[in-house]
């Protein structure tokens, strides 16, 4: 009987200990809101992914330091998709299945984000894309939002700016025929520029990974364009700009938010260059922007590009929705997000019926400041 009693006591003790363990886990889980993050932290656009993750982390740190959201702490679980759609899917599945995230910020590029939108919609996971500008990203359904403006708007901005601010009458375009981002920008630049009375005198293309653009640039040079539109990411644009200037093409070059970071990857060849962006970091007087930029510089030792600001805004969009709805449930938050009407680092923001943000774009000019390049505010273009 004593042996039975001892065994009984031991079993009860074990059950009690296990129960306490699970109670602790449950309490910890209940006090924490997991936010999944999918970013290209390595690969060709790693600088963008790292900046975006930094912005997300900084916002979460600020919110947690202020007491969290409705008494809950936010936790980022970040995954690297290397800029690969296939790896984006793997990262998404890991975050949802293993980490039990029902809110995800990501991915960064349009191709990687498009690979996971249908999964998120089917599984009722709230997906907030910080920088995927491809127009059909949110077509997957009402669980998919984005914080950035879309390619049609960016392309239109480039066309209007070239006509109205630069006074261009004709333009040449050199774009990546294998990249949806580049194609979308080119197509919408063309529409806006031609509808505004301009003429496209050259439309040349290349393939992803190409390094030599001299053949296309030779054709462009013969047309003597007033402006050259380069809708691609900073690494490729830096290569094109160097070859373009070497050929004696001195026309202004214009691009989009994929240029962000170009000043660290190019030289004087990108002077007389202009690009659309989500905010002006260096010379803004907006209190939210100034505070964000100063905090980022203090934390990371560098000036934040727009992808950091977009990641930062994603977290505050979610925070505001959580507070207003008094919920962290994805189904509730998606409804609350549609009611957004607030001021953020990248501008005053509401969502349209496709869950795309309605907000202005700024055009930045690359200038020489002493011995370094810097982007400065040039113009604002409203929706």
Predicted features and spans:
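Extracytoplasmic "Venus flytrap"
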Residues: 36-55, 79-86, 108-109, 174-183, ...
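Extracellular/periplasmic periplasmic-binding protein-like sensory domains
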Residues: 241-312, 366-367, 373-382
């Amino acid at each position: 009987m004593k042996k039975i009693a001892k065994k009984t006591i031991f079993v009860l003790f074990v059950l009690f200990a296990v129960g306490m363990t699970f109670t602790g886990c449950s309490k910890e889980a209940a006090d924490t809101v997991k936010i999944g993050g999918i970013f290209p932290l390595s690969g060709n656009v790693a600088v963008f992914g790292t900046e975006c993750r930094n912005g997300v982390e900084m916002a979460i740190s600020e919110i947690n330091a202020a007491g969290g959201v409705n008494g809950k702490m936010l936790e980022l679980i970040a995954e690297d998709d290397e800029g690969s759609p296939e790896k984006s899917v793997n990262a998404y599945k890991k975050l949802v299945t293993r980490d039990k995230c029902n809110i995800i910020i990501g991915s960064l590029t349009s191709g990687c984000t498009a690979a996971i939108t249908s999964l998120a919609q089917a599984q009722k996971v709230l997906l907030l894309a910080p920088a995927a500008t491809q127009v059909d990203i949110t077509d997957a359904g009402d669980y998919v939002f984005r914080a950035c403006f879309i390619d049609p708007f960016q392309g239109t901005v480039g066309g209007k700016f070239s006509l109205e601010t630069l006074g261009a009458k004709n333009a040449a375009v050199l774009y990546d025929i294998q990249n949806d981002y580049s194609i979308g920008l080119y197509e919408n630049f063309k529409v806006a520029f031609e509808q505004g009375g301009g003429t496209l005198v050259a439309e040349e293309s290349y393939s992803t990974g190409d390094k030599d653009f001299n053949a296309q640039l030779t054709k462009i040079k013969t047309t003597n364009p007033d402006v050259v539109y380069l809708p691609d990411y900073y690494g490729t644009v830096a290569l094109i700009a160097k070859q373009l200037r070497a050929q004696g093409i001195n026309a202004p070059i214009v691009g989009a938010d994929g240029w962000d970071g170009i000043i660290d990857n190019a030289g004087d060849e990108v002077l007389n260059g202009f690009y659309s962006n989500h905010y002006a970091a260096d010379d803004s007087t907006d209190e939210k922007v100034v505070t964000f930029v100063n905090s980022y510089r203090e934390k990371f030792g560098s000036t934040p590009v727009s992808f950091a600001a977009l990641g930062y805004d994603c977290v505050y969009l979610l925070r505001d929705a959580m507070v207003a709805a008094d919920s962290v449930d994805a189904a509730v938050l998606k409804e609350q997000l549609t009611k957004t009407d607030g001021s953020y680092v990248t501008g005053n923001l509401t969502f349209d019926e496709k869950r795309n943000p309605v907000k202005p774009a700024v055009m930045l000019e690359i200038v020489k400041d002493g011995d370094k390049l810097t982007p400065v505010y040039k113009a604002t273009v409203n929706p």
